[in-house]
Amino acid sequence: MYPFGVHAVMLRRPVSVIELPGYRQRADELLGAAEQDAIVDLIAYEPTCGDLIPGTGGLRKVRVGRRGSGKRGGARVIYYFYNAAFPLLLVALYAKNEKADLSAAEKKKFAALVKEITDQWRKK
């Protein structure tokens, strides 16, 4: 499932997943219900499957296929996984034909968002 040299942690119990509003809106625009469910299942059971994105405070990016596009021309899911006790956050989603990577401004914005959410979570 993963290229040589890539290791992912597969959990016996899925991590709780929270879809942030920006992700939810784009998921409804780009993906069908079955594709959305498959993404949640993949990431909930294999939360380290995505590549870490430098400069984002720990966000990860994973490629997913879309109807008629396949994995290479599909979509990219941006998410945050801290640990199995912390809910996994689905942060953003975009089609590969829209852009290749997050801009520096997006990275900064998402890093601040993740920091704010994790700081609030730790206060509980």
Q: What label would you give each PLM region?
A:
Residues 19, 39, 56-60:
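A generic structural signal for short beta-strands and their flanking turns/coil linkers
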Residues 21, 76, 108:
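Active-site phosphate/pyrophosphate-handling residues
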Residues 1-34, 119:
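Arg/Lys-rich, positively charged N-terminal/basic patches that mediate binding to nucleic acids
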Residues 33-36, 72, 107, 111:
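Amphipathic alpha-helical transducer elements in NTP-driven molecular machines
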Residues 26, 42, 113-116:
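Residues that form generic nucleotide/phosphate-binding pockets
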